[in-house]
């Protein structure tokens, strides 16, 4: 069996990849470089020249070859490799007639606990959003603590240390009061806090027992993240920006997080994500896969989640729950009580509809940063 072609499928804000073999069996993957999918597309076109004529079963070899063939790597290149890796696993599972998780060591669970996101930004509205998720059966909500990323301007109140910490703490307090104790929170900070703010906020919300604090500060300096982690009792989750296993390993050895967030569409695919899970298991670190993308990303995450012992919870995009992107699939994923059923179909368990690019026209994402009240730029 040989690879005969690699084609690109743009749809909505996503870029999917289809790898075709001479048997007629094909696999699908997804690019994680959202906002820069045009650049990733050029990488994929170059990798097509390498892949055509190759055996699709040599997944580790192809991953290593593409990774080591470039002097300069980074997010765009690794997103392209990720899409290819996922598609190759999809092919292998389909040819052998088994789900990918069977090729990764077998199933460790039948369903995957997930959390939905609350896209409201006042204490009252956030509490209402949590109640709605609980009504749907979810047992965990992602709270967008530091505000709406689509807003480009912050207010003067965000310059006041005590006011900012109190505002964010009030959000968590309102949500806890609304839903009671039998519900978890994930506190998404989007890298927007300073270390001092992160420590003060973490200590202020300790009594509400959030599951974890996600990316409280910019993750570029692991030593500083570790310092923040040492000064609060709430676990930190980070790692979504990592593009190789070495970056993930550093987070764990520096004790910067108790949960790591591999992105199968940015790290290099399922292949390195499985390695990260093994590293994390040895360090008693939980896996919370990053997944803000499309349905192929979700399906690939489920295969990883189903095959590892240290899975914690799965990010599940709320826009899928609202019905829009479920229509991208021939057979939608099943969600019940906040748990996603792991598909038992061969490969990654899903197929995109044939006319996906027509029903979901491609969109471009512009350059968007947030501006502080004084005119300076803040992290997004």
What is each PLM-predicted segment?
Residues 42-49, 61, 203, 209-212, ...:
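Shared catalytic-loop signature of beta/alpha-barrel
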Residues 3, 24, 47, 84, ...:
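Conserved, mostly hydrophobic/aromatic
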Residues 348-380:
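Extended hydrophobic packing segments that form well-structured cores
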Residues 1-28, 32, 319-326, 367, ...:
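Structured beta-strand/loop patches that form or line metal/cofactor-binding pockets in enzymes
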Residues 20-96:
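Metal- or metallocofactor-binding catalytic centers and their adjacent structured scaffolds
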Residues 111-231:
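Metal-dependent enolase-superfamily TIM-barrel catalytic cores that perform enediolate-based chemistry
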Residues 1-10, 16, 93-94, 98-110, ...:
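N-terminal amphipathic alpha-helix/helix-capping segment at the start of soluble metabolic enzymes
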Residues 99, 113, 184, 235, ...:
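Proline-centered loop/turn at the N-terminus of a beta-strand
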């Amino acid at each position: 069996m040989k690879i005969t072609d690699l084609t690109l499928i743009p749809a909505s804000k996503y870029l999917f990849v289809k790898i075709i073999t001479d048997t007629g069996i094909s696999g699908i993957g997804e690019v994680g470089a959202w906002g820069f999918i045009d650049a990733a597309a050029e990488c994929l076109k170059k990798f097509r020249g390498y892949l055509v004529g190759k055996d699709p079963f040599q997944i580790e070899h192809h991953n290593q070859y593409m990774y080591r063939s470039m002097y300069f790597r980074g997010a765009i290149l690794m997103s392209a490799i990720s899409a290819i890796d996922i598609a190759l696993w999809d092919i292998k599972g389909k040819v052998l007639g088994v789900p990918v998780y069977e090729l990764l060591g077998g199933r460790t669970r039948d369903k995957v606990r997930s959390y939905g996101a609350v896209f409201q930004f006042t204490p009252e509205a956030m509490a209402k959003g949590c109640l709605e998720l609980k009504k749907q059966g979810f047992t965990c909500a992602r709270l967008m603590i530091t505000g709406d990323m689509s807003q480009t301007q912050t207010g003067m109140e965000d310059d006041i240390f005590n006011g900012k910490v109190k505002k964010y703490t009030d959000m968590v307090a309102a949500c806890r009061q609304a839903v009671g104790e039998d519900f978890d929170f994930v506190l998404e900070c989007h890298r927007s806090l300073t270390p001092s703010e992160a420590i003060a906020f973490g200590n202020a919300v300790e009594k509400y027992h959030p599951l974890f604090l996600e990316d409280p500060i910019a993750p570029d300096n692991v030593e500083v993240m570790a310092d923040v982690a040492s000064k609060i009792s709430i676990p930190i989750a980070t790692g979504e920006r990592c593009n190789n296993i070495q970056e993930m390993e550093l987070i764990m050895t520096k004790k910067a997080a108790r949960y790591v967030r591999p992105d199968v569409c940015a790290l290099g695919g399922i292949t390195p994500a499985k390695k990260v899970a093994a590293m994390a298991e040895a360090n008693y670190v939980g896996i919370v896969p990053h997944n803000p993308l499309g349905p192929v990303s979700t399906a690939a995450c489920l295969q990883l989640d189903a095959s590892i012992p240290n899975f914690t919870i799965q990010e599940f995009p709320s826009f899928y729950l609202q019905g829009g992107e479920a229509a991208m699939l021939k057979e939608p994923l099943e969600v019940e009580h906040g748990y996603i059923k792991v598909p038992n179909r061969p490969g990654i368990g899903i197929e995109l509809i044939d006319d996906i690019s027509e029903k979901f026209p491609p969109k471009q994402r512009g350059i968007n940063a947030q501006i502080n009240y004084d005119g300076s730029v803040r992290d997004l």
